[in-house]
Amino acid sequence: MKNAFLKTHLFPLCPLDESGSQWLKDIEEQARKENLESLVSYFSAKGKQVDFISAVMTLSPFLREVLIANPSYLSPLLYVDIETRLSEIIDDVALIDKSESINETALMAALRRKKREAHILIALADLSGVFTYEISCTWLTRLGEAALGVALRFLLREAHDHGKISLSSRDNPEKDSGLIILGLGKLGAGELNYSSDIDLIVFIDEMSPHIGDLSESVDVFSKMVRRLIRIIQERTAEGYVFRLDFRLRPDPGSTPLALPVRTALRYYEGRGQNWERAAMIKARPVAGDKRAGFKFLKELFPYVWRKYLDYAAIADIHSIKRQIHACKNYGQITAYGHNIKLGRGGIREIEFFVQTQQLIAGGRFPQLRGRQTVAMLTELHTLGWISEKTSDNLIKSYAFLRNVEHRIQMLADEQTHLLPNDVSQFTSVAYLMGYQESSSFIRDLLKVLQVVEKHYAALFENEQELGLEIGNLVFTGEEDDPETLITLSCLGFERASDICRIMRTLHCGRYKATQSAEARERLTELTPALLKAFGAIKRADEAMLRFDSFLQGLPSGIQLFSLLQSNPSLLDMLVLIMGAAPRLAEIITRKPHVFDGMLDPTILSELPTKTYLENRLEYFLEGVIPYEEILDHLRVFADEQRFLIGIRILNGAITGEKAGFAFTALADLMIAKTLAAVQEEFSRIHGNIKGGRVGILGMGKLGSCELTAGSDVDLILVYEHDEDAEISDGEKPLYISQYYTRFTKRLIAALSTLTSQGVLYAVDLRLRPLGNKGPVAVSFEFFRKYYRKEAWIWEYLALTRARGIAGDPNFLQNLENEVCAIIALPHDKKDVAKAVREMRTLIEKEKPPENRWDLKMMSGGIMDVEFIAQFALITHVVAFQIGASTADILAHLPNSVLNQSCIVDLHRAYSLYTNLNQMIRLCLNDAFDPHDMPPGLSDLLLSSVGEPDLLRVEKLIEETAQSVCSIFKQIMKH
């Protein structure tokens, strides 16, 4: 059980002067007048707690005045802890309207008395160290909500009694009333400060059954809100409850105080600004029809939380910050007179630091949709957006500044954030903070403000200078500016006139991307850095032309130009893509949204696991129900994730082998999700087969976890069912064979059909039993019999890469067990070796290598390394394991088959081929031609294998192929 507040240890405060003893006499005298004998005795004892009260009264004129006038506020604290008493006060507030005789005047008086008592107790608990600032804010928020609630209930009942509105329940007037009161800012976040304004917006749910004529309801409820303002805000002899602010509502200069929901939604969707999105992050129903309030916020969700990263918001947020900079109290960091909310290094900078990143990424990361600043700083660190040090620094700084804010406001109960210029008042703030002298407080204060400024500047103010002085860049008029042509030539462009033409086209707004004045303004700011970056690469003109094609396809350029301004490193990446990777350039030209993922701070530090991808996809598909929309969303998600894996390859963050695992994990998830969507849609029409279960085997590079950027997926669909099953049980029943054939075709279409969002994966079913001559769906029984009695050796080789990737988990396990049993069947090494040699000869005849860079088909290339691995598995030289990659198998080759030197050579060959092949497949759509490739690609290839020039790479490939060819012949000589 907690001790009574006045009998527990209270944080000692240094008094401002010796006047405390006189103030104690005054409060003791008033207590005696009110017959508060226990309190009189308590003060007479002069314990340490009394010294605390004495110090508080010397430091805060407001607290002194209220305590001397109302010593009864302290009496309960002789017997109970402060939270118990505050709970009683909140309960009392909630019951004020229960009296049938209550009128507006009595309500206002009662609210002010209760608020004043709670206000004093919260201050004492805060100053004494019994409350942290978070607990103080929570109680202030509860008090604010309770006051709003009781006042609104009173007004709703009165309107109902006068026939102005109709309530579903007089006892619970807020329920289904259709009147929504949202708390924003500190109230919405549950973080009210000591003398805080309360930000509110009032909406009318026109769909409520109790809302009749809408224009009449707007009038009635707007008048009700005006009375609510009077009840809560008006200063009387007993003070006020809270100051209310309704200026955050849509277009406050021309809209009523109570606004219909549909009108509000139209406003936000059509005219809403980014600062309003930022405000809505903290929005929460605090009074009225809360069910309707939550419904409204759900409808507003897409406006606040955009699915794609929103970097255009940064400029707007920054412009708000610049307006704050213009305030007379912003200036430099100081102590006396500094605005600890709006000033440099203040509370608002921490809030903007958080809210900006919430606006940018909250649509993609639900963890960032919280209302509270500290919790979101923690999440930003957890997600990798900020470092642990940054998170800890800002959390500690926020706590310090909120405590300072409270103490400034406790001096006179004023909504101010200015540290006093007056030395005595400034000292009072320092002492209320627990310091013994002002100098220590100033030292810590300045340190905190500097820490906040540093972290805020890293996000907003220390961006790379994009307006570089590089010479004339004039793109107006019809003629080329001669000095601009010289500048472009100096930058590295060979066709300066063509570049001028491109830039003129952009700046005159002929593309959708630059039709808005804002987009052209952002482009103008970006142009010097843009041209310098492109000019620095080989064949700069060619890359710039690709960039021009990219911009032609953009529906809007504001987002991109803002993104590049806010993240200059992305400009370098974009230039690299345009100069070295035509395939990626084509992708972002068709689907520019994939570039958003580049803003994920973990992009180069973490490889996406299947679990990570599952979580991301779950959030991405949130609220998506129609079958076609699911398929489109899967394509969008896969495009972006493939692009991000590709960026990791380009940056050298992952090897080719790791990229194979990442591409495979993504494909596994996409196929599994597509299968689930197809099953649901197909069974809706055709029902289910009794005991029917489906399993999909991934074959080829999908099965061995070695996919590349442009890989097809090789699949086999296997099914089983109860013995007595004959036909499905749906509205349009199908016999078993027909059912699974159509089901498989539906699955193939879901994966490979070209929709508005492209193709998910090209599908190849030719590795199934009997290939193109066999059924597209194979029963488990047929699968077993075929591989045990009819399969060719090449089919056993292919089966070594089989892996269950989607379907019924238990059935998949049975399927994989059967694959293991089939691979365990005895095979004569000579027969296998002969078959492999014949197969290799046939392939070489029918599909000869195109050039020395045909890493797959050339003699001693990828195919030969894979044949060696597969041969080792079906001849049981290496134990078979589901999902083993080629590298895994090579690692287990025994020295009895190959000496260690040969095994090392195979490993090196596999690594070399994989790194080169992943890079080539990533960057190019067509076959690689060393005589006609993007200049940037050669640099990427060199860095991927650590060689200085292409001749050395070609020599390395040649030597490696000869080594592999020799090993292949050695193994296959049986």
From Swiss-Prot:
UniProt keyword Transferase, yes or no: yes
Reactions mediated catalytically: [glutamine synthetase]-O(4)-(5'-adenylyl)-L-tyrosine + phosphate = [glutamine synthetase]-L-tyrosine + ADP; [glutamine synthetase]-L-tyrosine + ATP = [glutamine synthetase]-O(4)-(5'-adenylyl)-L-tyrosine + diphosphate
Keywords tagged on the record: ATP-binding, Magnesium, Multifunctional enzyme, Nucleotide-binding, Nucleotidyltransferase, Transferase
Biological process (GO), any one: regulation of glutamine family amino acid metabolic process
Gene3D superfamilies: 1.20.120.1510, Beta Polymerase, domain 2, Nucleotidyltransferases domain 2
Record region (Adenylyl transferase): 468-974
Top-level lineage group: Bacteria
GO molecular function: [glutamate-ammonia-ligase] adenylyltransferase activity; [glutamine synthetase]-adenylyl-L-tyrosine phosphorylase activity; ATP binding; magnesium ion binding
Spans annotated as Adenylyl removase: 1-464
Record-listed E.C. numbers: 2.7.7.89, 2.7.7.42
Tagged with keyword Magnesium: yes
Record-linked Pfam families: GlnD_UR_UTase, GlnE
Cofactor: Mg(2+)
Family indicated by similarity: Belongs to the GlnE family.
Function statement: Involved in the regulation of glutamine synthetase GlnA, a key enzyme in the process to assimilate ammonia. When cellular nitrogen levels are high, the C-terminal adenylyl transferase (AT) inactivates GlnA by covalent transfer of an adenylyl group from ATP to specific tyrosine residue of GlnA, thus reducing its activity. Conversely, when nitrogen levels are low, the N-terminal adenylyl removase (AR) activates GlnA by removing the adenylyl group by phosphorolysis, increasing its activity.
Protein name: Bifunctional glutamine synthetase adenylyltransferase/adenylyl-removing enzyme
Gene: glnE
